[in-house]
């Protein structure tokens, strides 16, 4: 067991890291274009932050959190998602006193004790954005557009934007009563998890993917869009109107409720149907009570999160290659102790000039070192042996063109720039 990563986790090896860099750099670039600034919050938070915001009876809190008691007898939890920590950060640092709205993005690992499967891990990575301090429907559309632009920048197509409104405290209670009455005669046909959801928050039954529950829900289930108050209905209509004006196609999904208690009004997901059961690439919505729930003043918010592992799965299916491996500039080959010492000085000079370079310190033969230079896929090899040292020169070989240059050591810096560019 000591030689294996824990179940549900995954090592990222050097040959894979360039894909991750591409995902992260694209996220940063798109976020900056939209005026978002990066925030970083702790890997673990007080457990109460999640029980109060995400919902004590939600699947995340009741089944999936990694919670522990520290030596100070405090209950702490590895963050299962990023919105609640972002809201806590907003309150703790009194950012409600700054000009509103404030716009953040974050990238980092999250943790949930979930059943590992394709694209789903117990330690996974999310890119998310949050906007605090705006009630306007334009803000909802802006974060949706940012998410769609992110996918487009990665080359993903064939995606669908699903949309719904989950109402607010004022209009949701009547809907929950109707939904509870509707499910009352169907409780024998729903799974055990949904029975628990039925007792605490019947809306979550709509989110179940199990066939028995989908059949129990049926086509006659009450839809929340028919119970929205005037404010929520107007907001939802405006969101749809703006999406249409931007030529952004969407599908109304009346069963889209998201799995977290803090959502209000707009809820959305971007899905890739060809992925199968785990087709959601990312999603989010509005959370107008979350900041207040975290101890701050009443402050509206909206945001999304997207799973990077799920995106990599989608890219693989679409055969989109994000490899952006930076090529090594120089591979140093030296034979003999004096030559090695001189080569080590030149190695430092090359790096100071901004070129990447490695040197074989293992005292292999010239032939063995040349093989390693080829395997390293370097642009140039620099060769320094006794003969070159006696002549105060070195040999630089263009590994692609096969051309070789003799470079005097006294003009090394100038010639390196000419040769390597």
Curated annotation (Swiss-Prot):
EC number(s) reported in the record: 6.1.1.21
Compartment(s): Cytoplasm
Molecular function GO labels: ATP binding; catalytic activity, acting on a protein; histidine-tRNA ligase activity; transferase activity
Gene Ontology terms describing biological process: histidyl-tRNA aminoacylation
Assigned protein family: Belongs to the class-II aminoacyl-tRNA synthetase family.
Subunit structure: Homodimer.
The protein's name in its UniProt record: Histidine--tRNA ligase
Organism of provenance: Natranaerobius thermophilus (strain ATCC BAA-1301 / DSM 18059 / JW/NM-WN-LF)
Gene name linked to the record: hisS
């Amino acid at each position: 067991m000591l030689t294996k990563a824990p179940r549900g986790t995954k090592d990222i090896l050097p040959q894979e890291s360039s894909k991750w860099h591409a995902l992260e750099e694209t996220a940063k670039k798109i976020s900056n274009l939209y005026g978002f600034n990066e925030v970083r919050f702790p890997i673990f938070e007080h457990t109460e932050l999640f029980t109060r915001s995400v919902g004590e009876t939600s699947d995340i809190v009741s089944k999936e959190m990694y919670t522990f008691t520290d030596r100070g007898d405090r209950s702490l939890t590895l963050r299962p998602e990023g919105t609640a920590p972002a809201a806590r950060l907003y309150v703790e640092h009194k950012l409600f006193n700054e000009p509103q709205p404030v716009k953040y993005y974050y990238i980092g690992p999250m943790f949930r004790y979930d059943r590992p499967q394709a694209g789903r891990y117990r330690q996974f990575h999310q890119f998310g954005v949050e906007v605090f301090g705006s009630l306007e429907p334009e803000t909802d559309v802006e974060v949706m557009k940012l998410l769609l632009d992110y996918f487009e920048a990665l080359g993903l197509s064939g995606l669908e934007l699903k949309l719904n409104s989950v109402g607010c405290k004022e209009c949701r209670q009547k809907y929950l009563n109707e939904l509870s009455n509707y499910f009352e005669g169907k409780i024998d046909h729903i799974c055990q998890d949904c029975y628990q959801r039925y007792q605490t928050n019947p809306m979550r039954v709509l989110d179940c993917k199990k066939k028995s529950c989908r059949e129990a829900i049926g086509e006659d289930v009450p839809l929340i869009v028919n119970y929205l108050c005037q404010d929520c209905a107007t907001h939802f209509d405006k969101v749809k109107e703006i999406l249409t004006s931007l030529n952004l196609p969407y599908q109304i999904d009346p069963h889209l409720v998201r799995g977290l208690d803090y959502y209000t009004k707009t809820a959305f997901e971007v899905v890739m149907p060809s992925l199968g059961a785990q087709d959601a690439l990312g999603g989010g919505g509005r959370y107008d009570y979350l900041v207040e729930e975290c101890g701050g003043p009443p402050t509206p918010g909206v945001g999304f999160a997207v799973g990077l592992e799920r995106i990599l799965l989608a890219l693989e299916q679409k055969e989109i290659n994000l490899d952006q491996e930076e090529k090594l500039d120089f591979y140093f080959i030296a034979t003999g102790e004096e030559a090695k010492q001189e080569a080590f000085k030149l190695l430092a000079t090359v790096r100071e000039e901004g070129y990447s370079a490695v040197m074989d310190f293992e005292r292999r033969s010239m032939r063995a070192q040349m093989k390693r230079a080829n395997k390293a896929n370097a642009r140039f090899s620099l060769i320094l042996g006794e003969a070159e040292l006696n002549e105060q020169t070195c040999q630089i070989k263009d590994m692609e063109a096969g051309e070789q240059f003799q470079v005097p050591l006294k003009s090394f810096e100038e010639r390196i720039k000419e040769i390597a560019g």
